[in-house]
Amino acid sequence: MGIRKYKPTTPGRRGSSVADFAEITRSTPEKSLVRPLPKSGGRNNSGKITTRHKGGGHKRQYRLIDFRRHDKDGVNAKVAEIEYDPNRTARIALLHYVDGTKRYIIAPNKLKQGDFVEAGPSADIKPGNNLPLRNIPVGTTIHAVELRPGGGAKMARSAGASVQLVAKEGRFAQLRLPSGEIRNVDVRCRATVGEVGNAEQSNINWGKAGRMRWKGVRPTVRGVSMNPVDHPHGGGEGKTSGGRHPVNPNGKREGRTRRPNKESDKLIVRRRRTGKNKR
């Protein structure tokens, strides 16, 4: 993937860039692998906003991605197309299996139209092949990693993401995640070889607010710039700091929301570096 930069012909074009989509081989999705995707506008079933800054955007269809691949062990598949998916940053690959089945997978880097991929313990170590961690050599770069055997890929699925298999000991494999965290994962869990493609995605400059609106992202307005009727931080004479611990528009305290005693925390060997410890 490359990035095409625009000339500053208008204020919105100044500094903006777009993917060149050179790797895309098909513009319409496989009809049997898409489902309707109605928009919620960030509202729940009673109409209350539960997620702010969502609404509008272009219509989309959801592409059904195969995050498991267990049922196709030993069945060869040809990469028929590399496609754009509006629901994720990564590209997706359409596989035609020799038994006639069609499936979508996350497209890894260097996977091309016409390549063959396979799943199963005896598959070769090459991009796009899916194997249990116990059958992958230490040091291999992988993506689309399961957290529980048979649970489907959960980690390293976005553009440019990858995980490194750093060790295997007993029934656990140690993985270095993109955040720097090292975590134990059951060796029966499966992963796909290679890193996710479209790594240049993070370098795209959207250029103007309108392009974000096309994606369904609405403006983020600070609470301190609102009126008291709109937000607990609103109001005051002149500029204020809000005068209290940060809260959401409903008055609920904001900040760290991750459970500190999550069950899977016991599998973390080394925590990710945060704040001043990032260096």
From Swiss-Prot:
Q: Name one Pfam family in it.
A: Ribosomal_L2
The record, for SUPFAM superfamilies, names: Nucleic acid-binding proteins, Translation proteins SH3-like domain
Signal sequence segment: none
| Region spans: Disordered | 1-20, 25-59, 222-279
Q: One GO CC annotation, please?
A: large ribosomal subunit
Please list the GO biological process terms of this entry: cytoplasmic translation
- GO terms of molecular function: rRNA binding; structural constituent of ribosome; transferase activity
- Subunit notes for this chain? Part of the 50S ribosomal subunit. Forms a bridge to the 30S subunit in the 70S ribosome.
Q: What function does this protein fulfil?
A: One of the primary rRNA binding proteins. Required for association of the 30S and 50S subunits to form the 70S ribosome, for tRNA binding and peptide bond formation. It has been suggested to have peptidyltransferase activity; this is somewhat controversial. Makes several contacts with the 16S rRNA in the 70S ribosome.
Family stated for the protein in its record: Belongs to the universal ribosomal protein uL2 family.
Q: What is this protein called?
A: Large ribosomal subunit protein uL2
Please name the source species.
Renibacterium salmoninarum (strain ATCC 33209 / DSM 20767 / JCM 11484 / NBRC 15589 / NCIMB 2235)
**Gene name linked to the record:** rplB
